[in-house]
Amino acid sequence: MNVDKKQIEIKGKKIAYLDYGEGDVILMLHGNPSSSHLWRNIAPTLSKIGRVVIPDLIGMGDSEKLEGENNPGYSFNGHYEFIDEFCSELNLDNIHLVIHDWGSALGFRLAREHSEKIKSISFMEAIVRPM
């Protein structure tokens, strides 16, 4: 299945993402370093049961890079701010999180901050921060 990547501007930077299917949102967050490409084999199947949304995290995949390797936008909090605003801009609700590696820590925080929007969490090779 070929799906064209879309782009949205978040905090003045372009975030690339895939968005296809209908129904409850299945938000898939990749690890570091990686990209939405990680989910290429499972996403088409999941799109038959829901709306699959897969961003390339800031600085990864086809998303825009930040200036300077020590840019605070690459910190955990910086990454989280991009994901949080991404979800707000796309009005994501009824979210099933599918999270991996670095994306798991971001997803767990998203679940903590917006528990009313999260329906389920599936995680792999997770990084767990204190709640």
List the model feature ranges, each with a label:
Residues 54-99:
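Active-site loop/oxyanion-hole signature of alpha/beta-hydrolase fold enzymes
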Residues 40, 84, 108-112:
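Short, hydrophobic alpha-helix immediately C-terminal to the catalytic nucleophile
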Residues 1-26, 47-51, 68-70, 74, ...:
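Alpha/beta-hydrolase fold catalytic core
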Residues 43, 69, 113-114:
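Residues in and immediately flanking transmembrane alpha helices
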Residues 13, 18-65, 86:
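Conserved HGGG/HGGXW glycine-rich cap/lid loop of the alpha/beta-hydrolase fold
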Residues 93-131:
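Conserved hydrolase catalytic core segment
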Residues 10, 57, 126:
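Active-site donor-binding loop signature of nucleotide-sugar glycosyltransferases
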Residues 34, 72, 129:
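Nucleotide-sugar-dependent glycosyltransferase donor-binding/catalytic pocket residues
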